[in-house]
C-alpha cells in the first residue's frame, strides 16, 4: 500500500514540477528573424535567450530545422542552424526556444545502425529507444580518476606495432593527405585490432564481445562512406559498429556536432556498457573548415590562415574525450584522420592536433608513389604512450631496443641515400653500403605488407631482427649486450 502511495505521490510531484517549469519557462515562439548571414540566423526581441539553447525553426513550407544559440546580447540572439539556412524566409519563419541544451539519445542498440550527421537514423530502421539523453559536450573527466593507458593494442601492422605502439585509451591521429590510402589503413586497424596474445600465457581478451567501433565521417564523399560500410559488413563486424555520416553534400554546419554526437555515443558504450571503443573521426580538416565558416559568419578576428583563434581549445574538447576511467572497465581509443592541405605538416590543423594528441601516424606520399603499402613513414611518426605499453610481460623484452635500433638505422640510411645522390655510389664506405641495403630491405620487408596481412607483434619483431642481422654486432649500438646475446644469433627462435 505504501508503495502505491509513494508512486502516486511521485507522480503528483512530477506533474507539479512540469507545470512549475512551464510557468517559469514557457516555450515561446518568435517570428522576429531580423537577418540571415551564412549559417546564422539573427533574432530580435527574444525574452531571456540562453547560451547553447536549442531552437526549433519551422519554415514557411512546413519543414523543421534545429539550431543552437551561439551568442546572446540583451534581447538579441544569434542562432547557428545545423541543417543550413537556405530557404529560410525572415518574415514567415517560426522560431521556438526549447529551454534545453543539445542532448542525444543513447542506447546499446545504436550498434549496427547508421545515422546522419545530426544523429537521425538513415538506415530505414526504427528510431532509437533511448536508455538516456546525454549532453553532446560530454562530462569532463576528473584528471585524478583517469587511468594511464598501459595495454598495447596489436594492429597487425608492423610499422605501427613495433615503432609506434598504440595503447588502449590513447588518442593518436593519422596525418595524411589527399589521394593517400588513410581509409584503407584505418579499416585495417578496425579489422585487426586486439590485445597482444602472449605465447604460453592465456590472455582473457573479451575483444570479440566487448569491442565496439564508433565511426564519424565529416564532409567525406559517398565513396569513402560506402568503403567503410562495406568493409565492416564484409568482415562481419557491422553489429559492433555505429556510423555517423555527414557527407560532402550535407550541410557544413552539421559537421560541428557530428564528432560530438559520435563521442557521446562512445562515452556511453565505454563507461556505461563497459565496452572497449575505437573511435575513428574522418576528416578533421573538414571539421576545422566548418569551424572557420561559422567564425567568419560571426565576423570574429581570424587567426592563422583564417581559422579562429580558439581552434586549439575547440579541437581539445574533441580529442580529450578519450582515455580510461577508474572504476570502469571500458575505454575510448581515438584515431582521428586528417588530410593535410598541400601535404603541409605546419598547417594550423595538423600543427594544433599534434600538440593535443599523444603522437601521430604519418602517411607519406613518396612511399605511396613507390607502391609501398601501408605508406607509413616511421621517422616523423610518434607514439608518446609507447614506452609504458611495451616490454617484458606486455610484448617482449627486446621491443624498445629493436624499435630504437631500427629507427636509428633507417634515419642513417636516409642520410646515406641523400649523400649517394650527390657523390655517387663509388664514394660510399662499406658501412654506408650496409645502411643502403638495410634501407631497401626495411621498406620492402618490414613496412610493406598486404591489406589483409595480420602480423603478430612477435612476427614483426622477428622481421626486425632479420634486418638488423645485415649489420655486424658492433654496429648495433642501441641494443644492450645481453639482448644481443639472446636474440642476435640466427638460430634464436622467439
Curated annotation (Swiss-Prot):
One of its GO terms (cellular component) is proton-transporting V-type ATPase, V1 domain. GO terms for biological process: ATP metabolic process; vacuolar acidification. The keyword Ion transport applies. Pfam families: ATP-synt_ab, ATP-synt_ab_N, ATP-synt_VA_C. InterPro entries: ATP-synt_VA_C, ATPase_a/bsu_AS, ATPase_F1/V1/A1_a/bsu_N, ATPase_F1/V1/A1_a/bsu_nucl-bd, ATPase_V1-cplx_bsu, P-loop_NTPase, V-ATPase_su_B/beta. GO terms for molecular function: ATP binding; proton-transporting ATPase activity, rotational mechanism. The keyword Ion transport applies. ATP binds at residue 384. It comes from the Eukaryota. Keywords: ATP-binding, Hydrogen ion transport, Ion transport, Nucleotide-binding, Transport. Belongs to the ATPase alpha/beta chains family. V-ATPase is a heteromultimeric enzyme made up of two complexes: the ATP-hydrolytic V1 complex and the proton translocation V0 complex. The V1 complex consists of three catalytic AB heterodimers that form a heterohexamer, three peripheral stalks each consisting of EG heterodimers, one central rotor including subunits D and F, and the regulatory subunits C and H. The proton translocation complex V0 consists of the proton transport subunit a, a ring of proteolipid subunits c9c'', rotary subunit d, subunits e and f, and the accessory subunits VhaAC45 and ATP6AP2. Non-catalytic subunit of the V1 complex of vacuolar(H+)-ATPase (V-ATPase), a multisubunit enzyme composed of a peripheral complex (V1) that hydrolyzes ATP and a membrane integral complex (V0) that translocates protons. V-ATPase is responsible for acidifying and maintaining the pH of intracellular compartments and in some cell types, is targeted to the plasma membrane, where it is responsible for acidifying the extracellular environment. Essential for the proper assembly and activity of V-ATPase. This is V-type proton ATPase subunit B.
